[in-house]
Amino acid sequence: MLQPKRTKFRKMMKGRNRGLATGYKVSFGEIGLQAVSRCRMTARQIESARRAMTRHVKRQGKIWIRVFPDKPITKKPLEVRMGKGKGSVEYWVAQIKPGQMLFEMQGVDEIIIREAFALAAAKLPVKTTIIKRTVM
């Protein structure tokens, strides 16, 4: 699963997920899956969506993952009293903002790509839309 190789600090504050995304265009492939709402997407969810797409296109074409889980989420163990510091890192998330491009694909028929994106979107906790590349 995706996670940073090394970070400056082990734990991070919760923070807020506000604003709009900057990576909102289809940059690498022909068609992209774009987030419509905001969420915290875990590394497991990203991997699950990637596997669903890869299996549907039968390992043809090329898939780009445009999000990376770089924020650690901590959790204290069960039945532990409050206090005594912050819990250990449980999993990693990517903070998704509206308009962010999640996945891109090319090299396969458009109908198959749309079906693959539909399978991937079912595994994600965010509403999505499919965007085609516009050539200027």
Curated annotation (Swiss-Prot):
Gene Ontology biological-process entries: translation
Keyword Zinc: no
UniProt keyword annotations, A-Z: Ribonucleoprotein, Ribosomal protein, RNA-binding, rRNA-binding, tRNA-binding
Gene Ontology molecular function: rRNA binding; structural constituent of ribosome; tRNA binding
Keyword RNA-binding attributed: yes
Pfam family, one: Ribosomal_L16
Gene Ontology CC terms, in alphabetical order: cytosolic large ribosomal subunit
Protein purpose: Binds 23S rRNA and is also seen to make contacts with the A and possibly P site tRNAs.
Sequence similarity: Belongs to the universal ribosomal protein uL16 family.
Subunit description: Part of the 50S ribosomal subunit.
Name assigned to this protein: Large ribosomal subunit protein uL16
Native organism: Ruthia magnifica subsp. Calyptogena magnifica
Taxonomic lineage: Bacteria, Pseudomonadati, Pseudomonadota, Gammaproteobacteria, Candidatus Pseudothioglobaceae
